[in-house]
């Protein structure tokens, strides 16, 4: 059966698709495949834009390995099966009054896919999801089941290893007490967004902005961490649905489709989208503020540069887009 990743950048037709339920089944699959000289490639949600999950032989689908394995309430550590999607984790943690310390704005990935590919959120004081890993269980390329503890020098390599050391079948995360976030979304000029970026990321818990190429329009988002008893406030549920689902996904999706079919329309679409930006503020649980609904498919790439160089790099990217006449609808910095 053909497989495609979420961004439609890669596809594959594996010879066999297997959905194991535990580490023992994974170990048996790897051992038998190794004996015949074959290869096994694990896949989660397929949300990586790279070809890391492309399987030519055996595709190991992690979707049957999901759920909570254990909680250490005193240490705030939780152990999850490797195929657990990020969007299922908040409900698993809620009875224990815990939350993940940081998240990106997409939660479709599996937990092991997220850590293995470096999924991250924002905030200079908070690392990516892989930095919260305190232990993991791995099935190696020889079919051995190995537990990696927090004192093991290989832990960092397993936590953010692109699957190079084996299949991560469960992972233990250091969590935090449940908390709320207060969000401020502010339309601003691209010059202001870029010029004020360093000050904002250094003074705020979490800051990011989205810039619409071919315009001077940007939308900044700043999140402030609050206790779990902070009052939930902001737009009504209907207003948020209109903003987040109807406008940001359905209407924007139609505009993106039009731009992909007629690239010459992209600058005009960007101008319309940029002028439609509006500010809002709201307070809610950390997950509901961190995560955004993303049904419009997109393709992205990321570079790591020195923090102080970010403004000049962004200005050069902006100049290059104009100079080379690339047709892009929006970019973000997080």
Predicted feature descriptions by range:
Residues 116, 134-320:
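C-terminal substrate-binding/cap subdomain adjacent to the FAD-binding core in PCMH-type
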Residues 32, 36, 312-325:
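Generic non-transmembrane alpha-helical segments
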Residues 50-69, 123-142, 167-174:
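Structural signature of FAD isoalloxazine-binding scaffolds in flavoprotein oxidoreductases
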Residues 15-16, 75-80, 103-106, 123-125, ...:
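Flexible, glycine/proline-enriched loop segments at strand-loop-helix junctions
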Residues 9-11, 51-53, 70-73, 109, ...:
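Solvent-exposed alpha-helices and their adjacent loops that cap or buttress functional pockets
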Residues 8-105, 118-123, 209:
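Glycine-rich N-terminal segment of FAD-binding domains in flavoprotein oxidoreductases
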Residues 330-334:
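Conserved small/polar residues in nucleotide/adenosyl-binding loops
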């Amino acid at each position: 059966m053909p497989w495609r990743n979420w961004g439609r950048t890669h596809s594959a037709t594996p010879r066999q698709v297997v959905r194991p339920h535990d580490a023992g089944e994974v170990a048996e699959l790897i051992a038998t495949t190794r004996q015949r000289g074959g290869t096994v490639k694990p896949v989660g949600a397929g949300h990586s834009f790279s070809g890391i999950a492309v399987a030519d032989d055996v595709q190991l689908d992690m979707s049957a390995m999901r759920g909570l394995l254990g909680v250490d309430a005193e240490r705030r550590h939780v152990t999850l099966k490797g195929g657990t999607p990020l969007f299922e984790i908040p409900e698993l943690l809620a009875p224990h009054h815990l939350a993940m310390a940081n998240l990106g704005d997409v939660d479709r990935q599996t937990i092991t896919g997220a850590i293995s590919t470096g999924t991250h959120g924002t905030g200079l004081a908070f690392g990516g999801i892989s930095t919260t890993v305190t232990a993991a269980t791995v099935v190696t390329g020889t079919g051995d089941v190995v537990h990696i503890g927090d004192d093991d020098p290989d832990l960092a390599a397993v936590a953010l290893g692109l699957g190079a050391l084996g299949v991560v079948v469960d992972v233990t995360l250091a969590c935090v007490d449940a908390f709320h976030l207060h969000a401020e979304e502010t339309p601003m000029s691209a010059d202001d967004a870029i010029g004020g970026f360093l000050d904002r990321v250094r003074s705020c818990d979490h800051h990011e902005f989205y810039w619409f190429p071919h315009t001077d329009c940007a939308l900044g988002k700043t999140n402030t961490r609050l206790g779990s008893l902070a009052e939930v406030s902001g737009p009504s549920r209907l207003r948020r649905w209109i903003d987040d689902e109807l406008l940001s996904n359905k209407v924007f999706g139609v505009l993106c489709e039009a731009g992909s079919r007629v690239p010459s329309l992209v600058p005009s679409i960007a101008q319309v989208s940029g002028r439609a930006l509006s500010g809002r503020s709201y307070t809610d649980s950390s997950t509901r503020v961190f995560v955004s609904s993303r049904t419009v498919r997109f393709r992205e790439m990321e570079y790591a540069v020195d923090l102080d160089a970010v403004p000049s790099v962004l200005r050069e990217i902006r100049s290059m887009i104009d100079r080379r006449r690339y047709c892009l609808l929006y970019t973000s910095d997080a």
